[in-house]
């Protein structure tokens, strides 16, 4: 919560209150995203062997190992690849034996996907890429996310305020209910790095 003086509310243009509420909404979003990332990582109990982050063939082997395990556990194929920002950079730097990007951004032919550093619409190994800075370093999770095996329940209540006549101020807060839950851990696998 934040306490704002009546004078600050009355004498600012644009109104300081709107900026504070927007900032609190962003902080709420970051906190809930962090909770979801932590819950997904903590709830993912299956792992492959360590991947060599610079070896494209090892990445392919590990992703397919995850796919076959997820398929065997529930008859689903994975559809998402969740990674930390450092793994995002590792994947973007992978190249084939001719030094061509493994995931080119323009005109990919026979590529395993397409990605670029400025887009959230990336496909890696045929999986939708989700990059989150709230994951711990070296996080890579392959998952069948569209199955609902990991869910997030949220009611965003928004801002609330109360006037404080004794201090000629207003206390403002931003709140909501948020509960991430791993429903079926068999639909997710972690690819660790040494």
Residue ranges and their predicted role:
Residues 1-73, 190-194:
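Alpha-helical scaffold segments that mediate packing/assembly in large oligomeric complexes
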Residues 5-6, 144, 184:
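Generic structural signal for alpha-helix starts
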Residues 12-13, 90-92, 181-183:
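Short helix/loop capping segments that flank catalytic or ligand/cofactor-binding pockets
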Residues 19, 96-100, 188-190:
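Short, solvent-exposed amphipathic alpha-helical segments in soluble enzyme
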Residues 30-37, 76, 97-100, 181:
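Intrinsically disordered or highly flexible coil/loop and linker segments, enriched in small
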Residues 49-176:
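Extended oligomerization regions of viral-like shell subunits
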